[in-house]
Design a protein with these regions (language model features):
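Histidine/acidic-residue-rich, glycine-tolerant segments that coordinate divalent metal ions
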Residues: 1-3, 9-141, 224-225
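Metal-dependent amide/peptide-bond hydrolase catalytic core
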Residues: 101-286
């Protein structure tokens, strides 16, 4: 979609007053490419004043668009917990210090941070998605490794949950004669916050292309995006473009192994990109 927009904008550059930068997303999935790009000056020379992005959504009907002003996407952080015990024969657990039992207790107890410590009026997620320990049925291993993710709609919420994850994991490990090493590898993504004016502009640009009834407001979701590194610096808007179509079995969302795109949406996305850029430039030169 962005390559298509590049071609159209280039073919019409003599009619455009201003500069449009087209930014792709290296290392978006966990690598915080947006942070690296920002640090290397992608928003400078010339200075970028507004920024817009589209993300496909397989569960939204083809040709629809949705977003909102304010916080759209969550701040995110990775979790890694290494539980250390003392392995031995599974038939003699009393001669071991079992990290699997301890790790299991940690997984369960972390959920109470959301249900019992987070305000019901706030949003937060702790999901342990990987648990690795041992390689034999008759051996209690010496270590268990847990990995997962934390989500919150604020950076402050992420920091608070990180502190409590560390405290809870280490305390449970001590109570069970184990040791827990807790880390948060990689980069913490900030929340993606849409500027109100940019959403209004993006909404109008999308309605020109898709139609009034195809553009709507949506609720915040707990996914994360490295686009957030840009909106920390300048006003911007991140929107979702529907690519779903049950007639071709395009009904699964991103990250699903059966994810499929109705490619008719791609040309619409290109047109939305172009119209948004033109409207933004017109608005900035008024």
């Amino acid at each position: 979609m962005l390559l298509g927009a590049a071609r159209i904008l280039k073919e019409n550059e003599d009619k455009i007053e201003g500069t449009v930068k087209l930014i792709f997303q290296p290392a978006e999935e966990g690598g915080a490419g947006g942070k690296m790009m920002r640090e290397q000056g992608v928003l400078e020379k010339p200075k970028v004043r507004q920024i817009f992005a589209l993300h496909v959504a397989g569960t939204m009907p083809m040709g629809t668009l949705a977003s909102k002003e304010g916080t759209l996407l969550a701040a995110t952080s990775s979790i890694k917990i290494l539980v250390k015990g003392n392995g031995g024969h599974a038939a003699a657990p009393h001669h071991t210090i079992d990290p699997v039992v301890t790790g299991s207790k940690i997984v369960v107890e972390l959920q109470t941070l959301i249900s019992r410590e987070l305000s019901p009026l706030e949003s937060g997620v702790i999901s342990i998605t990987m648990a690795n320990a041992g390689s034999a049925t008759n051996v209690i291993p010496s270590t268990m490794e847990l990995q997962g993710t934390i989500r919150s709609l604020t950076s402050e919420g992420i920091s608070k949950l990180q502190n409590r994850v560390k405290e809870v994991a280490e305390s449970i490990a001590i109570a069970n004669r184990c040791e827990a090493e807790v880390s948060f590898p990689g980069n913490d993504y900030p929340p993606t916050v849409n500027d109100a004016g940019c959403w209004e502009l993006g909404k109008a640009a999308a309605k020109d292309i898709l139609g009034q009834e195809k553009v709507s407001e949506m609720d915040s979701i707990m996914g994360g995006e490295d686009f957030a590194y840009y909106t920390e610096e300048i006003p911007g808007c991140f929107s979702f473009l529907g690519v779903g179509n049950p007639e071709i079995d395009a009904v699964y969302d991103v990250h699903h192994p059966m994810f499929k795109v109705d490619e008719e949406a791609l040309s619409l996305g290109t047109a939305v990109h172009v119209n948004t850029a033109i409207k933004a430039l017109e608005n900035l030169t008024i």
